[in-house]
Structures are given as structure tokens and as C-alpha cells.
């Protein structure tokens, strides 16, 4: 496997790409008849991305995590998803004609680290609202929310996914 967790090497600056380390390995593998699986670099974001989008770092019940460790970005963040698609498409353009490439790996260690960013909150409330066809009374009933004054009277009152309500 090659090319995974090398995003900062492949895109050292936003929109500046360098896949020379990938092509160097692929050329050697072609010569030696070694099969290669291409891994996506997306489970470790480059520093420029964290700087440009501070809210791309995962937000969990303790708050926003700092940049540094791998896999602590919010995989639901719009910018993360945009840049993932872009780097993967660029990488595929580079590797597509090498006969030694026999497959692709789309992250083997995807994690979410309990992400509870605002976009996760909104997506969850939209999903639950759809499941209940907007029937907030049925939702309150099914979850017993009248007890301990947990009842919600509008979907905007839905409690944060960062914690739980008493229950």
C-alpha cells in the first residue's frame, strides 16, 4: 500500500499538488513487477487545512480538539469532504495508467471520535424529524420526554448531541 496518510506531502499548500513520491514508487514497482494498492491520504489532514478551517477539527463533548494527531477532523465537515474528493481525484489522475496498481483503499481507520459539531446536530435533528414525519408529539411520547421536564415543543429545542438529557 502506498500514498495513505501523506496528504501534507501531496498537497503542501491549498491547491498545490506534488505526487512525485507516488510516481517514483510506482515506476519502481512497474519495473520490478510488484503489485500496488493505492491508499487515500484523507485520514490525516494537512496543517494548512486546520489553519484555514479551525472548525474542521472534531468537536466532542469536551469541546474542539486541537490539530496535531491524525484522524481528529470532523469527517462530516463540508470543507473536509470537498478537499477529500479533490485530493482523491487528483491522485487517481496520477495513478490511473500504472499497470502495477491493482486496487484502491478508502481509509482503513475511519473514526468519528464522538463528533458533535453543529452540522452533526443539524443533520441528526433533520433525520429524527423525518423519522417522525415532523410529529413532535409522537417523538415526545416515544421517548418519555414529559418526565423530568425534557419535553420539546419545537425541533429547534432539540437538546445537543454533545450530551444527553436526563433520562
Task: Identify what each model region corresponds to.
Residues 66-167:
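Polysaccharide-binding and catalytic clefts of secreted carbohydrate-active enzymes
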Amino acid at each position: 500500500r502506498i500514498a495513505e496518510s501523506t496528504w501534507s506531502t501531496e498537497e503542501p499548500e491549498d491547491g498545490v499538488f506534488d505526487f512525485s513520491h507516488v510516481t517514483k514508487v510506482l515506476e519502481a514497482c512497474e519495473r520490478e513487477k510488484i503489485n500496488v494498492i493505492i491508499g487515500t491520504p484523507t485520514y490525516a489532514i494537512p496543517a494548512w487545512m486546520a489553519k484555514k478551517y479551525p472548525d474542521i477539527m472534531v468537536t466532542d463533548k469536551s469541546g474542539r480538539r486541537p490539530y496535531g494527531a491524525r484522524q481528529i477532523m470532523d469527517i462530516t465537515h463540508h470543507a473536509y469532504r470537498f478537499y477529500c474528493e479533490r485530493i482523491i481525484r487528483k491522485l487517481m489522475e496520477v495513478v490511473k495508467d500504472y499497470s502495477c496498481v491493482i486496487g484502491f483503499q478508502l481509509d482503513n481507520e475511519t473514526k468519528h471520535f464522538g463528533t458533535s459539531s453543529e452540522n452533526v446536530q443539524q443533520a441528526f435533528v433533520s433525520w429524527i424529524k423525518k423519522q417522525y414525519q415532523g410529529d413532535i408529539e409522537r417523538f415526545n411520547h416515544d421517548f418519555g420526554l414529559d418526565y423530568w421536564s425534557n419535553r420539546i415543543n419545537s425541533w429547534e429545542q432539540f437538546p445537543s448531541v454533545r450530551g444527553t438529557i436526563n433520562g
